[in-house]
């Protein structure tokens, strides 16, 4: 069965706010189709966003929404889920919002296995504020705050969240929307624990222009060519993996989840 997800979009607000060529629209399409496939209702779904280009996503959704402060989307999402565990809570964060300014919240939400889904749009830059480097900007990359090349190594966010203890972690790219949608759908259907999707995205306006990566079609084709599966990556040496994007499911395990454990504590406390 094919899904279009239109009931979750405010069609009267289209086209999207984002720059021409931005991959956020592709990620949005994957999300709303996955929501429909997973049987979500707009009445029972809350989308939490932070600050940044990706933070504008909640403007276009018919679900409940909470537009939070920079780096704090996961704290808000945690509070909503604890207050009403029956809600489907989705946090949409960028690499600046979720992995850099909000990085500590990300680690601990994964460690606690808060029962929410987090979808990170990772375009390796702070797009809204002028193309500064973030915690995922690759070593050597040019940005408005690293004019002669970035001197820091980047986070592999999916590996970080996996190591922190999340129940489900997957990485996809806007070059393969069908695969990305499958990962998101699986995360939505997995009820217990912390679910994290890293969507590798493109920013032609800042990151692409600064690093002479061409326009959107060229950047998407570059993503496609540099992507390899986790299965293949396991048999490759570190130098062979340089510049590669390792896509696939990093972890998929059964956990109790924070809500279930919290309810058990409540029962014991009530005796």
How would you name each of these model-derived features?
Residues 3-69:
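Active-site diphosphate/adenylate-binding microenvironment
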Residues 51-53, 123-125, 176, 200-206, ...:
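Glycine-rich beta-alpha junction loops
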Residues 134-186, 190:
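Conserved thiamine diphosphate
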Residues 1-3, 14, 202-271:
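Flexible, low-complexity linker and terminal segments
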Residues 51-127:
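Thiamine diphosphate
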Residues 14, 41-45, 83-89, 111-116, ...:
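Short coil/turn connectors at secondary-structure junctions
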Residues 64-65, 109, 134-138, 187-188, ...:
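Short, hinge-like loop/turn segments at secondary-structure boundaries
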């Amino acid at each position: 069965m094919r899904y279009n997800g239109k009931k979750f979009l405010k069609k009267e607000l289209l086209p999207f706010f984002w720059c021409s060529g931005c991959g956020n629209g592709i990620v949005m399409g994957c999300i709303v189709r996955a929501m429909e496939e997973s049987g979500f209702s707009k009445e029972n779904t809350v989308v939490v966003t932070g600050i940044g280009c990706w933070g504008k996503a909640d403007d276009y959704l018919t679900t409940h929404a909470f537009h939070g402060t920079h780096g704090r989307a996961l704290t808000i999402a945690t509070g909503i889920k604890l207050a009403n565990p029956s809600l489907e809570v989705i946090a949409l964060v960028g690499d600046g919002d979720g992995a850099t300014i909000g990085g500590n919240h990300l680690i601990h939400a994964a460690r606690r296995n808060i029962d929410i889904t987090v979808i990170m749009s990772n375009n390796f830059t702070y797009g809204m504020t002028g193309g500064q480097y973030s915690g995922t900007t690759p070593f050597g990359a040019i940005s408005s705050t690293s004019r002669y090349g970035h001197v820091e190594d980047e986070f592999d966010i999916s590996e970080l969240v996996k190591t922190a203890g999340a129940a489900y972690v997957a990485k996809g790219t806007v070059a393969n929307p069908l695969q990305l949608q499958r990962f998101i759908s699986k995360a939505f259907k997995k009820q217990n624990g912390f679910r994290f999707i890293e969507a590798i995205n493109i920013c032609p306006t800042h990151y692409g222009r600064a690093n002479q990566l061409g326009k959107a079609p060229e950047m998407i084709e570059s993503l496609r060519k540099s992507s390899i599966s986790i299965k293949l990556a396991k048999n490759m040496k570190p130098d062979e993996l340089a510049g590669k994007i390792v896509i696939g499911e990093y972890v998929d395990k059964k956990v109790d989840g924070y809500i279930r454990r919290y309810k058990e504590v409540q029962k014991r406390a009530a005796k």
